[in-house]
């Protein structure tokens, strides 16, 4: 997994089934929002 921002929402997301963040926005696969990360 790779910590990065998903969509236009603020905060850090963890990709459980994807390597990297496409274009720095948007996401595919499992993306869970983690508070405090």
Swiss-Prot record:
Q: Which UniProt keywords apply?
A: Disulfide bond, Ion channel impairing toxin, Nematocyst, Secreted, Toxin
Q: Which Cys-Cys disulfides exist here?
A: 6-31
* Keyword match RNA-binding: no
Cite a GO CC annotation.
Answer: extracellular region
Write down a Pfam family by its short name. Answer: Defensin_4
Source taxon at top rank: Eukaryota
Q: Where in the cell is it found?
A: Secreted; Nematocyst
GO molecular function annotations of the record: ion channel inhibitor activity; toxin activity
Q: Which family does it belong to?
A: Belongs to the sea anemone type 3 (BDS) potassium channel toxin family.
This chain belongs to which protein, by name? Toxin Bcg III 28.78
Q: Please report the organism this UniProt entry assigns to the protein.
A: Bunodosoma cangicum (Sea anemone)
